[in-house]
Amino acid sequence: MSTDIRSKFLQVYDTLKSELINDPAFEFDDDSRQWIEKMLDYNVPGGKLNRGLSVIDSYQLLKGGKLTDDEIFHASALGWCVEWLQAYFLVLDDIMDESHTRRGQPCWFRLPKVGMIAANDGIILRNHVPRILKKHFRGKPYYVDLVDLFNEVEFQTASGQMIDLITTLVGEKDLSKYSLSIHRRIVQYKTAYYSFYLPVACALLMFGEDLEKHVEVKNVLVEMGTYFQVQDDYLDCFGAPEVIGKIGTDIEDFKCSWLVVKALELANEEQKKVLHENYGKKDPSPVAKVKELYNTLNLQGVFEDYENTSYKKLITSIEGHPSKAVQAVLKSFLGKIYRRQK
């Protein structure tokens, strides 16, 4: 991804933000305009922007040539819709998880003047997506498919979040409920669809493709998303907080993490007892005991094996696709996440 494309992408953010804070559907005064602007700047462009930039990247690989300014603008606008959706999920997710930091700074709802106003801000972020789509894509033949796609993916993500939340209900902590199949369901719906399938699906629609004919592409991307989340689970415990931008809390939050599922699979009865007694406790001492057990079970080595096997399987699936352009899109995606440290 050239720095030129990245800077053009960031310029499109400024354009979209300006349109939204001057939206004629609402009579903004200075206070509300400033609030929205601050809220957007704090939550939307702060991450790595991988999802958004992937729309441009994927479209470029499908087209196989230089993009016109118009194509760059439209691919960027779709990329920002993905980033807006992500911001909406994260703002609300942080409230639900009672998180403290996100992308190396305090979560939005933790700011003194924000608090629970963040819940409404999340709703506003979500409502910005159809406004961007309507303004810039209404005349396109694929407009309805785009709206459907974003609605579908939002539903899948919210449903995945629900499984995640009800599996970790306080007072009903039961590790025996956790398995690889539950983990996979949460990951597939909560992360894989919006982080992996959505950006590529946007590029395919923009390129004039029918998504119904690309079920195999969806399957590969969902697999990739699963692999990505396993990496995330691993980094939550073994990654350096200053590198990943947050302090991992999966153990304290009783999350159905790949690590705990694997630990339950590999542990003997005595070790399982340690997990049952310490997993999901907020104090540093039980957390340290869980981490110690993870080291005893060599989960770092188990993860390395998983990473290598997953990579080989994904490459085989990708190379089975008839279109070289689609292969390039999928390989580009995989290249961005293979062996990542954050």
Curated annotation (Swiss-Prot):
Pathway: Isoprenoid biosynthesis; farnesyl diphosphate biosynthesis; farnesyl diphosphate from geranyl diphosphate and isopentenyl diphosphate: step 1/1; Isoprenoid biosynthesis; geranyl diphosphate biosynthesis; geranyl diphosphate from dimethylallyl diphosphate and isopentenyl diphosphate: step 1/1. Signal peptide: none annotated. Its EC number is 2.5.1.10, 2.5.1.1. Mg(2+) 1 binds at residues 93, 97. The keyword Isomerase does not apply. It comes from the Eukaryota. Its cofactor is Mg(2+). Catalyzes the sequential condensation of isopentenyl pyrophosphate with the allylic pyrophosphates, dimethylallyl pyrophosphate, and then with the resultant geranylpyrophosphate to the ultimate product farnesyl pyrophosphate. This is Farnesyl pyrophosphate synthase 2.
